[in-house]
């Protein structure tokens, strides 16, 4: 049985969650926390399998609640939204960066009745996320700026584009990478991040405010610029048109994913061939693997996040198992490798896979 702790001050959300769970013998709502502080305390005392935290536009800081849970009693956390996602984008981005696994919509009601497909999706997501192994986080110490490193001389032909695919745990991993890449990166970065609709604008805004690179949601036909990060919009496929422009389309899902990492990797492979670099980050499932086949056949390079630093090792494991990855790296080493490869230098050392 999955034991759920709900953190909400909203009677409406409490009622929706209770009604969704009451008909499922494999799920139990153990208690309701009325504040972030209560949620942290109850998590340590009750040891639930998962904590569902309401995304609040006011009051307690949702991100701080997640952060404190990860420090005091590491437990899978999902954020629940029952409002317009566009109003909560920045808040959700901070919560995901703090360690929340996903933002999911609360079960939807039609009149007095809950919609059965919404109940099933809600419960299946809660159960899947409750199985994720999370690790304790530590309070960050203030550190001085790192001294700039001398760049090794150019040793190889540089790449022209970077594609990144991520799912569960991705927002925090993406931020960890982008904060360590300087604004003068000579190539653009395109990112597919699986998440609920309505939150990608907030993620882009949050990243743009906290990392050296320019971060935005991709627009069809936009010119590719170096040092710029483009995030796939909701329910759209992201790729390139030739070597100079973005292509944002309503093309069909690839293996159920839209946006899809495989779609992105295949698109950049066709345009940039051996001058493309793909990075597969933490996430459930196997998105990205199919696209890596095309990218590797075109001569491109691929990096996968290692198991220890992944929240969920599904996507990287699939890519590694298929023999499509050049380097398997801990999260903290990926930015350095992207920068080195983009500048045409020999890659910093990592675990090599061929």
Swiss-Prot record:
UniProt keywords, alphabetically: Chemotaxis, Cytoplasm, Hydrolase, Plasmid
GO molecular function: phosphorelay response regulator activity; protein-glutamate methylesterase activity; protein-glutamine glutaminase activity
E.C. number: 3.1.1.61, 3.5.1.44
Catalytic activity: [protein]-L-glutamate 5-O-methyl ester + H2O = L-glutamyl-[protein] + methanol + H(+); L-glutaminyl-[protein] + H2O = L-glutamyl-[protein] + NH4(+)
Entry GO terms, CC: cytoplasm
Functional summary from the UniProt entry: Involved in chemotaxis. Part of a chemotaxis signal transduction system that modulates chemotaxis in response to various stimuli. Catalyzes the demethylation of specific methylglutamate residues introduced into the chemoreceptors (methyl-accepting chemotaxis proteins or MCP) by CheR. Also mediates the irreversible deamidation of specific glutamine residues to glutamic acid.
The name this protein goes by in its record: Protein-glutamate methylesterase/protein-glutamine glutaminase of group 3 operon
Annotated organism of origin: Rhizobium meliloti (strain 1021) (Ensifer meliloti)
